[in-house]
């Protein structure tokens, strides 16, 4: 596998994990594994700037936006924090701050509570809006649900607060409430929540506020924004906020030295296990707001803060058996079934084994005592075997299966890949259902009223066997089914009918062609007039398209070489989907930026970064991630990074403001 293919593979993998984490609330890997993959991708992109892509996961924050809520723009971008698991990197952060400020400073150390982020807006002492983090620039308005959380004041105490301000924090589900909720779900034979974070996030997105109220969510607030804040100190502002009625952690501490910072980290690395809520690290912030402003931001995170993540906990337990799960792409994942063991405050009974190489490397046998970790405190995995605990009665060696556990097809393994795949795309149940779930998702066909449970029911009843079958459903076919009244049935049919107006690029993405994500789908839609042109394209034509390499091109060719796929696309075409480029799709396209490479940097007022990327592409320009002598100009918002500014000046690259850019393309 060459470097470009490795970068593309990591991007595709991280995009998938972002979606699972932020949209589905169903993470497949731990925080640490995600961070490690992200860091690997960042290192590769840094070493190979020729493959930089503004749509790379390294350039985004992630999203938890839900189409069932109104989306609201954040007045101040809600950025994520840079993460580290290393004390050495904490020292590096401290030294960077010291050198940049060249004056005395304090570090505010706070518990990193493991819940779901929220932004609360107060006007004249009353709560007027509660918005999730979303993609950092806009989030879901969940005000009604947040008003059910008793630790969040609806009306403030006193009268010395600003007339309008924003306060941010974390919505949490205490361990005790989480465990009781899972006991209730288990009794009803419903899927359990993986952890309190998922439970809090899922609860906040419920449509029924009375159920939200019953879940007993809690909240800690940790940052004030706005004009006329009472103090320059972040810590001091939090103490004032506590007087107004906000729940502020009393564990927060101001540190004068790096030694004090490490004392705080080391103490809570042990004592956090005794807290009533989940934590996964310590947040370090420069205390002075003036100094924070001077340090500024990168595109993704503030330079004045960092999150130190605690190392994973480990426990020893017995391996009872290994089962296998099949995903949408046919990837087969081995799962270890274990004796129940307490780990990071939850009971662990299953752990991921990832792939055949991991199983072979561990030399696993049934009955082995194995070490289980929860990297980043979420997904358990087996990291080792206590071979000294083996008796002379060694259990059966675990060998990766050769046939699909769902349909019996012989598994295959693509060159250069660790996973095994079931090739039976059109008749393997988990693949069929997974493809339909991808097809109906928000970023694809966005079909209202349909979700995984409904898809599963329709499939079990034989109503659908592929995505094209959706367009043959009638309201009479589905009304009267379990929890499916006449109104619900009509809403689903209406949603399916409305999806016929979804533009060509999203239909291409919805097809689920391997390695064809949103960005590649856009490139394809711009390069081909309709699906027939794409189907007839050869390798040479495909790889001539910007950002489509041989790996993606061969995947497209493989997809259309399958007769079942060609038949499916034909049926979708007959159903009336937009498998062609319309004049509306191409409206707004110009060549005003043709041949120009443009870097976006900073925080913007008029449009989001993604909207500016679209404007650049629609006007014939190319988004690039790093500044070089070939850069045509930089579109700069507020808080442009000083390193980029210095490099631009050194290379003589033009810097345009938002207004100048909009005038240029008008």
UniProtKB/Swiss-Prot annotation:
Residues where NAD(+) binds: 31-35, 80-81, 110, 133, 170, 285, 309
GO cellular component term of the entry, any: cytosol
Domain of life: Bacteria
EC number of this enzyme: 6.5.1.2
Pfam families: BRCT, DNA_ligase_aden, DNA_ligase_OB, DNA_ligase_ZBD, HHH_2, HHH_5, Nlig-Ia
Function recorded in the entry: DNA ligase that catalyzes the formation of phosphodiester linkages between 5'-phosphoryl and 3'-hydroxyl groups in double-stranded DNA using NAD as a coenzyme and as the energy source for the reaction. It is essential for DNA replication and repair of damaged DNA.
GO molecular function: DNA binding; DNA ligase (NAD+) activity; metal ion binding
CDD domains per record: LIGANc (cd00114)
BRCT domain mapped to chain residues: 588-666
HAMAP family for this protein: DNA_ligase_A
Family: Belongs to the NAD-dependent DNA ligase family. LigA subfamily.
Cofactor: Mg(2+); Mn(2+)
Protein name: DNA ligase
SUPFAM superfamilies: BRCT domain, DNA ligase/mRNA capping enzyme, catalytic domain, Nucleic acid-binding proteins, RuvA domain 2-like
The entry's keywords: DNA damage, DNA repair, DNA replication, Ligase, Magnesium, Manganese, Metal-binding, NAD, Zinc
Coiled coil: none
Catalytic activity: NAD(+) + (deoxyribonucleotide)n-3'-hydroxyl + 5'-phospho-(deoxyribonucleotide)m = (deoxyribonucleotide)n+m + AMP + beta-nicotinamide D-nucleotide
Catalytic residue list: 112 (n6-amp-lysine intermediate)
Any single biological process term in GO: DNA replication
Residues that coordinate or bind Zn(2+): 404, 407, 422, 428
């Amino acid at each position: 596998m060459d470097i470009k293919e490795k970068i593309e593979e990591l991007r595709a993998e991280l995009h998938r994990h972002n979606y699972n984490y932020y949209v589905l609330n169903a993470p497949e890997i731990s925080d640490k594994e995600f961070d490690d993959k992200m860091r690997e991708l960042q290192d590769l992109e840094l070493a190979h700037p020729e493959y930089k892509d503004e749509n790379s996961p390294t350039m985004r924050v992630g999203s938890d936006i839900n189409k069932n809520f109104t989306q609201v723009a954040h007045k101040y971008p809600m950025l994520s924090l840079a993460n580290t698991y290393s004390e050495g990197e904490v020292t590096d952060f401290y030294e960077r701050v010291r050198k940049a400020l060249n004056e005395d400073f304090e570090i505010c150390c706070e518990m990193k509570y493991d819940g779901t982020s929220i932004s609360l807006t107060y006007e004249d002492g009353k709560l007027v809006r509660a918005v999730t983090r979303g993609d950092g620039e806009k989030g879901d308005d969940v005000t009604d649900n947040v008003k059910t959380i008793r630790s969040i004041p609806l009306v403030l105490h006193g009268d010395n607060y600003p007339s309008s301000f924003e306060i941010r924090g974390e919505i949490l589900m205490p361990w005790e409430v989480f465990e009781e909720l899972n006991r209730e779900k288990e009794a009803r034979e419903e899927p359990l929540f993986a952890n309190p974070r998922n439970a809090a996030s899922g609860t906040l997105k419920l449509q029924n506020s009375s159920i939200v109220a019953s879940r007993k969510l809690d909240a800690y607030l940790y940052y004030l924004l706005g004009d006329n804040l009472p103090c320059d100190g972040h810590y001091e502002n939090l103490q004032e906020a506590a007087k107004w009625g906000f729940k502020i952690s009393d564990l927060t501490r101001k540190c004068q030295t790096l030694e004090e910072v490490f004392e705080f980290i080391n103490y809570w690395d042990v004592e956090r296990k005794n807290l009533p809520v989940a934590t996964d690290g310590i947040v370090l912030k420069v205390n002075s707001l003036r100094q924070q402003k001077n340090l500024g931001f990168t595109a993704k995170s503030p330079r004045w803060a960092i999150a130190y993540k605690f190392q994973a906990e480990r426990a020893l337990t017995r391996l009872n058996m290994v089962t296998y799960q099949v995903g949408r792409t046919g990837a087969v994942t081995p799962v270890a079934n274990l004796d129940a063991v307490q780990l990071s405050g939850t009971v662990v009974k299953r752990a991921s084994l990832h792939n055949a190489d991991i199983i072979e490397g561990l030399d696993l046998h049934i009955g082995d005592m194995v070490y289980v970790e929860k990297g980043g405190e979420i997904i358990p995995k087996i990291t080792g075997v206590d071979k000294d605990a083996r008796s002379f009665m060694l259990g059966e060696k675990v060998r990766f299966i050769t046939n699909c556990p769902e349909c019996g097809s012989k598994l295959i393994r693509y060159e250069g890949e660790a996973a095994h795949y079931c090739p039976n795309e059109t008749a393997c149940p988990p693949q069929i259902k997974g493809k339909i779930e991808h097809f109906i998702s928000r970023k694809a066909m966005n079909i209202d009223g349909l979700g995984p449970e409904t898809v599963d029911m329709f499939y079990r009843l034989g109503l659908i066997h592929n995505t094209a079958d959706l367009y043959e459903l009638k309201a009479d076919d589905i009304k009267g089914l379990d929890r499916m009244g006449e109104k619900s049935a009509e809403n689903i049919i209406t949603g399916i009918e409305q999806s016929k107006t979804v533009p060509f690029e999203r239909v291409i993405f919805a097809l689920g062609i391997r390695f064809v994500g949103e960005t590649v789908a856009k490139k394809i839609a711009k390069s081909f007039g309709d699906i027939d042109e794409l189907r007839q394209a050869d390798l040479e034509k495909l790889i001539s398209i910007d950002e489509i390499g041989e790996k993606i091109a061969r995947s497209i060719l493989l997809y259309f070489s399958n007769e079942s796929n060609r038949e499916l696309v034909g049926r979708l075409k007959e159903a009336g989907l937009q498998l062609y480029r319309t004049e509306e799709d191409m409206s707004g396209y110009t060549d005003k930026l043709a041949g120009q490479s443009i870097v976006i940097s900073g925080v913007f007022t008029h449009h989001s970064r993604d909207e500016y990327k679209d404007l650049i592409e629609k006007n014939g320009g190319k988004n690039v991630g790093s500044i070089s002598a070939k850069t045509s100009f930089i579109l700069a918002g507020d808080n442009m990074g000083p390193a980029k500014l210095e490099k631009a000046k050194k290379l003589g690259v033009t810097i345009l403001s938002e207004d100048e850019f909009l005038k240029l393309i008008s």
